[in-house]
C-alpha cells in the first residue's frame, strides 16, 4: 500500500540522516547529497546520490554506509546505490537548516 511505502520512505530518510559527510559536519540529506530516493513495491530501494567533491577519498565508505544502513531498515529487500556527479553538488542544494548551521545564511 502507499501508506506502507511512505512509512518505509520516511524511515529510510531518517536513517540517511545518520550518515555524515566527512568534510562538512552535516548529514547527507540536509546537505542535499541524496538526489533521489525511490522505494518500490517489494521493498526495493534505489538511491541516487552525490558527494561534495569528486575524488573524495572516503567516497566508497559513504556509499557502503548508505547501503548498509538502508539494508538494515525493516521491510527493505534490495538496495541499489548509484553515485553520480551530474549535476555536480553545490551549496544551493542544502536545506535552510544546513545553511544556517554552517553559517551560510
Residue ranges and their predicted role:
Residues 3-105:
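Domain-level signature for proteins that mediate thiol-based redox and metal-cofactor handling
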Amino acid at each position: 500500500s502507499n501508506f506502507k511505502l511512505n512509512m518505509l520512505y520516511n524511515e529510510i530518510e531518517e536513517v540517511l540522516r545518520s550518515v555524515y559527510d566527512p568534510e562538512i559536519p552535516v548529514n547527507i540529506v540536509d546537505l542535499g547529497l541524496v538526489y533521489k530516493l525511490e522505494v518500490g513495491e517489494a521493498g526495493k530501494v534505489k538511491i541516487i546520490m552525490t558527494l561534495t567533491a569528486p575524488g573524495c577519498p572516503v567516497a566508497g565508505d559513504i556509499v557502503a554506509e548508505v547501503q548498509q544502513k538502508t539494508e538494515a531498515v525493516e521491510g527493505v529487500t534490495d538496495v541499489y546505490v548509484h553515485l553520480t556527479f551530474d549535476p555536480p553538488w553545490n551549496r544551493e542544494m542544502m536545506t535552510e537548516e544546513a545553511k544556517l548551521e554552517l553559517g551560510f545564511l
